[in-house]
From Swiss-Prot:
Gene Ontology BP, a term: glycogen biosynthetic process
Enzyme class: transferase
Pathway: Glycan biosynthesis; glycogen biosynthesis
Name this protein carries in UniProt: Glycogen synthase
Record lineage: Bacteria, Pseudomonadati, Pseudomonadota, Betaproteobacteria, Rhodocyclales
Enzymatic reactions: [(1->4)-alpha-D-glucosyl](n) + ADP-alpha-D-glucose = [(1->4)-alpha-D-glucosyl](n+1) + ADP + H(+)
Gene: glgA
Pfam families: Glyco_transf_5, Glycos_transf_1
Length: 494
């Protein structure tokens, strides 16, 4: 019996702090919607657990109560409600109004300030996730595998290892190692963590409590969201202080590249585009460029290389590299269309640059799903100069839309973009342009490489088609997770 058929017998609890479209702040929300659906398509019995934020309660308003969760330690009582995501995957909503019913986002209030009780909010989520994967499950349904995501669920493996009976094996997926869920150590008592766990061989991290470290230390397996990122986080440059622990657990660490929703991101059917197209009708991409230029007030110029960016405006994303490179870029036949929000200093800088050269630079501050799709289709190339990028999704969307990405060689960008070479172009491997150094000069050099190929319309079309031929669907990644679940289950039974 192959691994996928064995996995079809497994019950998997997918614990997450966000899941699109019910609650989303970034890529984790998309992954939490798509991966469980792909696992269910393989025959696994998957259930998603997430907090009952107001948006979740509204979306799951027909959910029915299936269990009461009694207060434990310093954690409040709650209810479990059962509903279904739009994909049809079952969802358990953790309803606790005192912790989750707030007007802000999942992690911060409306002013962008972290909630002061986040340790309790996500401690409860982790504790309930662990119970559902143990003999203490409040439901008849009990998970064979607990799949945790980032720091908000990372305390669950610790609960499983520190006393819950009949604990199932767990894995923690690292979507971004920089977010570590660090709190004062004295909150551990309210979370019900035993004294023996409050040490460096446990949840303690430089005199504080780290949810993420707890997951990395106690989980049976660790997954990073790309093979390259799995290697990078074991180094001082990218380990965010956790590289020593990750090195000791290297034999339990794997990298599995995220996928994308190939239906939602499909230029042939995308309702947001002026003209739909595919690899066979790539000439129909051009009207989308003209429409984007008109919408954003850019000069109508078929010959300019229109660079698109849809990004958070943060240091991690290398936004300063693009700003510093602008004088050189504007000396070339280049236009830029940016959509994003984040650090106020970057927002202001982009507003100023766009106001100074509105024919060449357009900056829309904030996020607009429709415009994001239109930039992917209307841009000639897509820029992602990230200092680090665990996986990244926009470079996959770009290739899907025949928009070659210009990316820094880090993390998932390395694993999903084929660097241009003449041989690679004709072998079908080249799909974009990579640069190594996080400097404005390296970015400009990569844009120059793109301009040279852009001038050769036949080569450029081949490059676009190479990207469009790539399979970024979740099927392959889901299969790798399924095989990992089978291995975890077998190891636990040995």
């Amino acid at each position: 019996m192959n691994a996928t058929r064995k996995a079809a017998r497994l019950r998997v609890l997918f614990a997450t702090p966000e899941c699109a479209p019910w609650a989303k702040t970034g890529g984790l929300g998309d992954v939490s919607a798509s991966l469980p659906a792909a696992l269910a398509a393989l025959g696994l019995d998957v259930c998603v657990l997430l907090p009952g934020y107001p948006s979740v309660r509204q979306a799951a308003r027909n959910a029915r109560k299936v269990a009461d969760i009694r207060s434990a330690h310093g954690l409040p009582s709650a209810r479990l409600l059962r509903g279904r995501l739009p994909s049809g995957v079952p969802a358990l909503v953790l309803d606790c109004p005192s912790l989750y019913r707030r007007e802000g986002g999942p992690y911060q209030d409306g002013e962008g300030v972290d909630y002061t009780d986040n340790a309790l909010r996500f401690g409860l989520l982790s504790h309930v996730a662990a119970r559902l994967a143990s003999a203490a499950s409040p439901l008849v349904w009990r998970a064979d595998i607990l799949h945790c995501n980032d720091w908000p669920t990372a305390l669950a493996p610790a609960y499983l290892k520190l006393g819950l009976p009949g604990a199932a094996p767990s894995l923690i997926v690292v979507h971004n190692l920089a977010f570590q869920g660090i709190f004062p150590l004295d909150v551990a008592e309210r979370l019900g963590l035993p004294p023996e766990s409050l040490k460096s061989e446990g949840v303690e991290y430089w005199g504080k409590l780290s949810f993420l470290k707890a997951g990395l230390y106690y989980a049976d397996r660790i997954v990073a969201v790309s093979p390259t990122y799995a290697r990078e986080i074991r180094t001082e440059a990218h380990g965010c202080g956790m590289q020593g622990l990750l090195e000791t657990r290297a034999n339990r660490l794997a990298g599995i590249l995220n996928g994308i929703d190939m239906d939602a991101w499909n230029p042939r059917t995308d309702p947001h585009l002026d003209t739909n197209y595919d690899a066979d009708t790539l000439e129909d991409k051009a009207p989308n460029k003209r429409a984007l230029q008109a919408e954003l007030g850019l000069a109508a110029d078929d010959d300019a290389l229109l660079l698109g960016m849809v990004t958070r405006l943060t240091d991690q994303k290398g936004i300063d590299l693009v700003l510093d490179a602008l004088p050189e870029l504007l000396a070339r036949p280049v236009q830029l269309a940016l959509l994003g929000g984040g650090d106020a200093r970057f927002e202001q800088a982009w507003r100023q640059r766009a106001a100074a050269r509105p024919d060449r630079i357009a900056a829309v501050i904030g996020f607009d799903e429709r415009l994001a799709h239109r930039i992917e289709a209307g841009a000639d190339a897509f820029v992602m100069p990230s200092r680090f990028e665990p996986c990244g999704l926009n470079q996959m969307y770009s290739q899907r839309y025949g928009t070659p990405p210009i990316v820094r060689a880090t993390g998932g960008l390395v694993d999903s973009v084929g660097d241009f070479s003449v041989d690679g172009l004709h072998r079908g491997e080249a799909s974009g342009f990579l640069f190594a150094e996080a400097t404005p000069a390296a970015l400009v050099e990569a844009v120059d490489r793109a301009l040279k190929v852009f001038a050769d319309r036949v080569a450029w079309r081949t490059l676009c088609c190479n990207g469009m031929a790539r399979d970024f669907s979740w099927g392959g990644s889901a299969g790798r997770y399924a095989r990992l679940y089978v291995a975890m289950r077998a190891a636990a039974a040995a």
